[in-house]
């Protein structure tokens, strides 16, 4: 039962027989939650050393993306007089 509890909150209602739209909505929800990627990854056995490498890479990528987003947000602030000074 514990394996199925995570699927309780992913119920999508089919409105007016629109099965394709409901399927797209469900697929988007599962992708945003990371479940599709997790299921694909667990399809085959992953050696412990490869798992550590993957988790380390994902951590580095997450840190890089957060820092890059912070720098871009700093550069794109609207309260500066002229964001393109000297051009």
Curated annotation (Swiss-Prot):
Pfam families: Ribosomal_S21. The keyword Ribosomal protein applies. One of its GO terms (cellular component) is mitochondrial inner membrane. It is found in: Mitochondrion. One of its GO terms (molecular function) is structural constituent of ribosome. GO terms for biological process: mitochondrial translation. Gene3D superfamilies: Ribosomal protein S8. Keywords: Mitochondrion, Ribonucleoprotein, Ribosomal protein. It comes from the Eukaryota. Belongs to the bacterial ribosomal protein bS21 family. Component of the mitochondrial ribosome small subunit (28S) which comprises a 12S rRNA and about 30 distinct proteins. This is Small ribosomal subunit protein bS21m. It comes from Bos taurus (Bovine). The gene is MRPS21.
